[in-house]
Amino acid sequence: MALLQIAEPGQSSAPHQHRIAIGIDLGTTHSLVATVLSGKPKVLNDVQNRRLLPSIVHYGDNTTHYGEEAKPFIIADPKNTIVSVKRFMGRSKADIKFQHPYELVGSENEMPAFETRAGRKTPVEISAEILKQLKARAEDSLQNPVNGAVITVPAYFDEAQRQATRDAAQLAGLNVLRLLNEPTAAAVAYGLDQESNLATDRNYVIYDLGGGTFDVSILRFSQGVFEVLATGGHTALGGDDLDRLIVKWAKKQLNIDVLSDEDYAVFIVAARQAKEQLSTQDSVELKLLEATLTLDRPTFESIIQVALDKTISVCKRVLRDAKLELTDIQNVVLVGGSTRSYAVQKAVREVFAQEPLCTINPDEVVAIGASITANQLIGNSQDGSLLLDVTPLSLGLETMGGLVERLISRNTAIPVARRQEFTTYQDGQTAMLIHVVQGERDLVEHCRSLGRFVLHGIPPMTAGQARIEVTFQVDADGLLTVSAREATSGVQAHIDIKPSYGLSEADTERLLIEGFQHAEEDKNLRHLKETKVEAERELEALEQALKVDADLLDEKQLEALNSAKGSLKAQLEGSDIQAIEQAVQQLKVHSDAFAALRMNRHIDHALKGTKLDDWSKSN
């Protein structure tokens, strides 16, 4: 499918010159690289004819091992063997709650580094090592340098996690054409647009359960256009978690409370093997230390049911977001190695009441879709479809009273830009703090802060006179830039949102679920805050007017005005909206009379020294 005809970085200016573009699935458990050869996508093998590169890096005394060569060290040297590094990407040390054998260093609010035999290594550096291996594989296989790459990320990755992925790619020497959502890549791989001869719209569910992340997206194909209607997921739910549930069961069976790092690694390997074998066998044996356990399919289903229930809950919520019923879904596409599990396929089949599509190798489908997109973006091919990704969470900024003004709503198609005018709150205000937030709630304190910057140089004016245009721009990779410009002076400032850590799975889930649960409460609270802000603005304006023209009021009038002011200030201490609004109206009775006196004075001052003839001449 042809994306919007906008030149991307690295795009060929010579339309008939074939350039090498690759698609990379940078996975939690495995990673792959694919390209398009003679019009057909192909997953590239290494010199030993292996397609999957385990996402593992081992740091030895004098050498570094990757992939399959690093696997034996998971048990032999777990502290120096980094597995599932994707789960650490763009996350703060405080966010990392899951069990792991590593020594993490750094402050709680920053992305940590792993303490290894080769020194401290960040998740970005380790991911770059994996990407370098894939790039080298592609160049060895194709005997040509790679001109550009599309790298896939979970649809639910936030700003920090996407930026960390792009940083890793650049560190690996890759020209990043685009970061592409994994479910979107799967849609491209399946060529769902080939059903374009159908007159009716087609809706598809992409159920992607990988090694460490879960994503579900609903795509609609209509009149040659792919659109992502809604997305959801968990940034830390996947095959790794199924393995951990099996380990938890095994520990209970063997009456073990705590495992050493070395023994835990043994249990994880055995659990993973058992999970894979149960896709084709009714029961398997787990050899754990000096004990052997038997695990059958029904027991396995009951063990992982809690994880499956989470994925189904997300599916139902995304259906609600898209305003669709189960009967509106034409196909369900399975993506990710964990969907090979018969238990996963059974759960999906029962929920959607149809046989899911899994004709393409679920481990390879994302890389294949990425390679097709890369081939298009590099300028090698064009066809008739358009692909629109969406923002996973709403983006906005803080206004007076700690309220959130949303500029870009969740599930908005990207790339996108939104502009909105704001103004100053106080007389003579010469600077404005722009606080950018992400989330679904109406109060800043309930959303996630993405960054702050200050617009300086605003000309001093009366409150409400300045015009500040704020622009939110999300690019095709889902990365956000915010700019602000004052209209009369032209002064401007901007920020590229590059936070040092991302949302934990708990925070991501909280932002969405609380947004739904507290919608009515937030609406009422927003009304209260807005009412208070407007009342405080009235009081501030009145205070300034009294400093200049209080002599216009006699003692009785001033006393009545001050009494109404005091009454309003007292009501502002509470949370009774109706009482505040009544106090505002009572104050307006006196302040309007005062305003009329002020206007008369200013008119008299303006007319002083003029004659009637002057007015006649002007007419």
From Swiss-Prot:
Example of a GO biological process term: iron-sulfur cluster assembly
The UniProt entry, under SUPFAM superfamilies, shows: Actin-like ATPase domain, Heat shock protein 70kD (HSP70), C-terminal subdomain, Heat shock protein 70kD (HSP70), peptide-binding domain
Which InterPro entries does the protein's record reference?
Answer: ATPase_NBD, Heat_shock_70_CS, HscA_NBD, HSP70_C_sf, HSP70_peptide-bd_sf, Hsp_70_fam, ISC_FeS_clus_asmbl_HscA
Asked whether the keyword Oxidoreductase is assigned, the reply is: no
Q: Which residues cross the membrane?
A: none
Highest rank taxon of the organism: Bacteria
- Record's family? Belongs to the heat shock protein 70 family.
Q: What does this protein do?
A: Chaperone involved in the maturation of iron-sulfur cluster-containing proteins. Has a low intrinsic ATPase activity which is markedly stimulated by HscB.
NCBIfam families (alphabetical): HscA, PRK05183.1
Recorded hits in HAMAP family, A to Z, give: HscA (MF_00679)
Q: What is this protein called?
A: Chaperone protein HscA homolog
Write down the species.
Answer: Acinetobacter baumannii (strain ATCC 17978 / DSM 105126 / CIP 53.77 / LMG 1025 / NCDC KC755 / 5377)
